[in-house]
Amino acid sequence: MARSFGTAEFLFLLEAIPSTLLLSLGALAGGAIVGLFVAILRIVPSRPLRWLATGYIGLFQGTPVLMQLFVTYYGLAVLFRIQVDAWPAVLLAFSLYSGAFLGEIWRGSIEAIPRAQWEAAECLSLSFPKQLWYVILPQAARISIPPTVGFAVQLIKNTSIAAIIGFVELTRAGQLMTNTTFKPMIVYPIVAALYFILCWPLSLVAQTLERRIDAALGIKQHF
């Protein structure tokens, strides 16, 4: 028998927000580690390493994240012959997915640094790793902040895909509540509004940071 949608049902949806944010932060942290290595491999002198990074990016950017989630969830179970919980599978899948996109964002930020900065580092007789660490990466980090925050917004919304394997985040909570109340036209607009509340402030932060960095670099914006 269907039940009405009231305060308890709304609170159930709110209780799913922490798991959504935790998954997003975990995937962003894991993706940051992977993405940094990918970005560096994309610019190293070694051609095989550049090919490896390019292949990784092509694989994860060129396939649906849903398929990546399926392969991770069921692949781990088959490979290790164990029952895999949804949480580690989802976290791994989204970390690998995030790494491909963050790697390209950060590679572009590194390559945006003027060549004169590299030449100045070479004049100081710094090795390639030290050039990156002391000269290039600090400047690239500043440039990469707006697109990284923008990707974080997309990542929060993409975590809704985790509902397909039963991970209880905001979308899955909405599905469960719809199954008990039979009121999808009430539940899903509320879920959408909660996603908007989570993502809109980050979008504003990304736009503000982009304007400030463009102003610092002397780039004119056209509206």
Model-inferred region functions:
Residues 1-223:
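Transmembrane alpha-helices and adjacent helix-loop boundaries
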